[in-house]
Amino acid sequence: MAVNMDGEERIDAPIGKVWEALNDPEILKACIPGCESLDKKSERELAATVALKIGPIKARFNGEVELKNLKPPHSYTIEGEGKGGIAGFAKGGADVALKEDGDGTILSYTAKADVGGKMAQLGSRLIQSTSKKLAAQFFADFNKKVSGN
């Protein structure tokens, strides 16, 4: 089942600080809902464990993420795949772009994911709404952490 999302968030911090935060595993771990571990394997690769509850299904995903098309401090593409045992899998990516906005930064993203297994049987409406909720939670936490507000 395909899930598509896009959006724009204003982060109350300069573009350089936002770029650094987007590449800092500790900051990302603190902001990604359910993230139990996020370890840098190389300059462009991360290993992650994320535990989520989607509807009646609880899953722990182990996966890898790769950063591509890096154009510091303006954009990158993030691609990854996670396996959650019998709960299923998720794989996908996002294009992330930053642009200066006065003393802040506009972060825009376009994300696509493919979800399979038991999770896909929950239906697209639940998966889509949960994805949007998780994205909103990430950006609220990320903005707070990066801006210090």
Predicted segments, located by residue:
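Hydrophobic pocket/interface hotspot
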Residues: V18, L22, L28, L67, ...
